[in-house]
Amino acid sequence: MAEHADTQALLRLVTWLSPAFPVGSFSYSGGLEQAIHQGLVTSADDLRLWCETLLERGNTWNDALLLSESYRAYGDAQRLIAVSELAEALAGSRERHMETMLLGEAFLAAAGHWPHPSLAVLGTKAAYPVSVGAVAGAHRTGLKPALAAFLNATVSNAVSVAIRCGITGQRDGVGVLARVEDTIGAVVARAAAASLEDLGGATFIAEIASLKHENLHSRLFRS
């Protein structure tokens, strides 16, 4: 089947990765709230560095690889199940596991309005990047557009977290999105050409923040 590099594919990606899509991503910070609480992220510049680091060598990079593999594997039940199990195992903390699995479950439920028989193998539960990748692959949106939409949505959610935590305003938050565009583009190109052999990360502070967050006394987010 040919890739749908057209308006329909674009509309679907914009819808699926929109803040209005009912997955509940607004309630998760991926450890960013803890980093803000510790004074590790205090400005728009800090936020940009945080996002770019995760994109290039953190869990966001791994999510991009998992999405790519799921996109390619959508018609191969055994391969798709394997990447789904791997994605769940890679969750580095209890809250990170909760976040990726609940987002993935909600995404699959909402994406049911765009049914495809090959998605039945996932059932109702899969990690978030696997759910997005499999659905995008089944509907042939194009891998690079799917990656770009997913990564941009991830950064957008981090900006929303930062605004609600009071470390940046809306204008500077949008500025972060503008300044991260080139990094997203580079990561899209890398991830589309990479494989699961390229999984890995070196963002220990972010991982520890995710672990510590569950003990944060007063918080706005679930992770």
From Swiss-Prot:
This protein's UniProt keywords: Chaperone, Cytoplasm, Nickel insertion
Name recorded for this polypeptide: Urease accessory protein UreF
Similarity comment: Belongs to the UreF family.
Gene3D superfamilies per the UniProt record, alphabetical: Urease accessory protein UreF (1.10.4190.10)
InterPro entries in the record: UreF (IPR002639), UreF_sf (IPR038277)
GO molecular function, one term: nickel cation binding
Keyword Iron-sulfur in record: no
One Gene Ontology cellular component: cytoplasm
Subcellular compartments: Cytoplasm
